C-alpha cells in the first residue's frame, strides 16, 4: 500500500479512470474496486467460487451495495441439483439488480457469468409472510409447490413445507432455521423459528419474511405441459416426473428444453456497468 498512501481518494479515482496503469498489491483490490463503484456499477469476475466469496466479503467492508452471484456447484448436465442456498443467493441478487438506481458491485466466478439461467425467476415475486397478512392456506400451498417446494410430513431440509391444521411449517433456502406460521382462519397470527431436531419453536420473528423460490426451474402449469409434450417424443424419466408435478434431483439440467428465455447475468446489470476481471487463482 506504500505507493498508494500519498494519494488522496480523488487522485486514486482519477488514476483508475485514466489510461495509465496503477500498480497496487492484491490487498488493496477491494478498496480500489469500491472506489471505482462510486462512479458506476461493476461486475467483478473471479476465477473460482472461493475467490468470489472471499472478495465479496472484503469489498462489502467498503461498499455495502455488494452482491454475490455464485455458480452452481454442479455441472449443467449432471443429474444433481444446485444447493438451495446457492439458488437463493442467485435469485436474491437478480431481484436486487432490478433497482437500477444503485451502483451495485456484483461478484461472480467465471462459471456463473457464462452460464445462462432461467430469466423467469427475475420477475417471480417472493411471497411475503408477516403477522396480520391473510392467505387462503390451500392457495398458499399451491404457490409453494409452484416455487418448487416439496410437501412433507415433517420439515427437516431447505425447500420443504408441511401443513397440520392451521399451522404451516416451511424452510426457505435463505434462512438458517425453518419457520412455523400459525394461522387463525386466513390470518397469520404468529411467526417463529423452530429447531429441526425437536421441532420446537425457540424464537419469535418480529418482522416479515420473504419466501423465495428454492429451485431455478419453477414447476408451473406451463412447464408441466411442456414436459408432458416432450415426454411423448423423448423417453426421459425427469420429463415424466416434472409433467406429474414432481421435483426430481437434477431437473435443472432440462432448463434449456423447458424454458424459452435464458439470459446471462450481464443482461441484468445496469446499462452503464463495467466489468473487472480478477482471474488470478
Predicted feature residues:
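ASCE RecA-like P-loop NTPase motor cores
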Residues: 1-281
Amino acid at each position: 500500500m506504500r505507493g498508494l498512501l500519498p494519494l488522496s481518494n480523488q487522485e486514486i479515482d482519477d488514476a483508475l479512470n485514466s489510461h495509465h496503469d496503477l500498480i497496487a498489491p492484491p490487498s488493496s483490490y477491494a478498496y480500489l474496486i469500491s472506489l471505482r463503484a462510486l462512479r458506476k456499477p461493476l461486475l467483478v469476475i473471479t476465477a473460482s467460487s472461493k475467490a468470489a466469496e472471499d472478495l465479496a466479503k472484503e469489498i462489502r467492508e467498503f461498499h455495502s451495495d455488494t452482491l454475490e452471484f455464485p455458480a452452481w456447484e454442479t455441472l449443467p448436465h449432471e443429474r444433481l441439483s444446485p444447493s438451495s442456498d446457492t439458488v437463493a443467493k442467485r435469485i436474491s441478487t437478480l431481484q436486487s439488480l432490478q433497482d437500477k438506481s444503485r451502483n451495485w458491485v456484483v461478484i461472480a466466478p467465471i462459471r456463473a457469468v457464462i452460464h445462462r439461467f432461467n430469466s423467469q425467476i427475475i420477475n417471480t415475486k417472493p411471497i411475503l409472510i408477516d403477522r396480520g397478512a391473510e392467505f387462503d392456506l390451500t392457495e398458499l400451498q399451491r404457490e409453494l409447490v409452484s416455487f418448487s417446494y416439496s410437501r412433507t410430513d415433517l420439515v427437516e431440509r431447505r425447500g420443504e413445507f408441511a401443513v397440520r391444521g392451521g399451522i404451516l411449517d416451511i424452510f426457505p433456502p435463505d434462512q438458517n432455521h425453518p419457520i412455523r406460521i400459525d394461522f387463525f382462519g386466513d390470518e397469520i397470527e404468529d411467526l417463529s423459528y423452530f429447531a429441526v431436531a425437536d421441532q420446537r419453536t425457540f424464537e419469535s420473528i418480529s418482522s416479515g419474511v420473504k419466501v423465495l423460490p428454492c429451485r431455478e426451474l419453477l414447476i408451473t402449469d406451463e412447464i408441466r405441459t411442456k414436459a408432458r409434450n416432450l415426454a411423448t417424443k423423448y423417453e426421459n424419466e425427469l420429463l415424466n416426473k416434472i409433467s406429474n408435478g414432481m421435483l426430481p434431483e437434477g431437473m435443472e439440467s432440462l432448463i434449456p428444453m423447458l424454458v424459452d428465455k435464458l439470459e446471462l447475468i450481464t443482461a441484468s446489470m445496469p446499462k452503464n456497468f463495467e466489468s473487472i476481471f480478477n482471474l488470478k487463482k
